[in-house]
Amino acid sequence: MNSSIIRYILGSVLKLEGALMALPCIVSVIYKEEEGLSYLAVALGCLAFGFLLTFKKPKDTVFYLKEGCVSTALSWIMLSIFGCIPFVLTKEIPSFTNALFETISGFTTTGATILDDVESLSHTSMFWRSFTHWIGGMGVLVFLLAVVPLSGGSNVNLMRAESPGPSFGKLVPKLKTTARLLYLIYFGLTIIQIILLICGRMPVFDAITTSFGTAGTGGFGIKNNSISGYSLYIKWVVTIFMILFGVNFNAYYLILYKKFKSAFAMEEVKAYLIIIIVSVVCIFFNILKMSTSAVNAITDSAFQVASIITTTGFFTTDFNLWPEASKTILVILMFIGACAGSTGGGIKVSRFIILIKSLGKETDSYIHPKIIKKIKMDGKPVEHEVVRSINVYFLTFIIIFTVSVLLVSLENKDFTTNFTAVAATINNVGPGLSKVGPICNFGGFSALSKYVMMFDMLAGRLELFPLLILFHPAIIKEIFSVKRKSRV
């Protein structure tokens, strides 16, 4: 294993985190808050460690998927550990476990919180908490590829390890250009949302932090009641942008280059929009009688469907009080998730499409055993290797989910709480149902359960395997052998 390039990547990530921590420091100056000193200290620490790790450039800059997965998993763990230190130093979240949970939830764009009173945080910490969503939304390593030349053609292994979904690839021949293009679209949509929210008389600070949460599909609000206290206009702006950030970014690339027919013909995007429309209609009629008006019913149903399927986690109402049918739809949407190549979480719409087509193919083979039928996506045949990897992904997901529910259930909480808590964390949604509903939090869980859910959040964001590979005996053996060689 090429440990020198892994070390260099980790150092680059630390330097990036240190640089990004300058923003909450600026916020602390604007609001005259002393919490900024803690962020400055951690930022300088990140930069110092980062420079130490990158001082000696690796001679061998070529690495493969194995190194890409290890680099990605370790980068996200390290990013979260250093990112949580300011919360502890400011004593706004004094417990390291709680601070780490909150930070992992931020970077993985989950939005599950342990805080009872979000509004008690300083503006500095509120900003950093929301900013972690924006950093993690498109992926920290994708950002790194956009600004730092790492290792030539091998960069694809970093993007492959971090990118959400089974069909994310290069938009243009040069990977660096792809990364920059992705962030250009990401940044552009974020700025447009901020402007539209400010036009709706939302305070500038609120507009920026809300847009961070929407863009990264994270859902950390700066109000205890999330988005429910804002105007109807703001609710609809957030709804629309949640849906937009849940779309495969390849579609925006095609639109930018005026390939409208190809963009609107994308099978996954069409399925994604159909699922949203059907879900909104079903929930609307289900909650109409209990709503104060039809306008509120359609607003709440559209907002919550968009929030859950994109795994954002904002809320405008306590959907814990909705009828069972509506809550069931929301739980199903948690697992479906957004499109591949978006900032959303969940299993991804494309995986379900291929799985359903695979099921249809197997059924047809029983009826017509001599006919060879290929699975197609957007009119193109899907390689057998892709279908196989999706089947393995589903099996792995089920195993991790089942084990996690069993471990969390040791606390003796009700089944709905345990099931949806794990579903909300592994799918990077945020709120669940019952005791982890939208107006509740995860603070009541034990340290064991919190660490289980931290693992789930990281596994869900990294598409399971980059994190799991750290526990592979061969990788552990290589890591320890590298340590022994370095001592010698």
Q: What are the roles of these predicted feature ranges?
A:
Residues 1-488:
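Membrane-proximal intracellular helices of multi-pass ion channels
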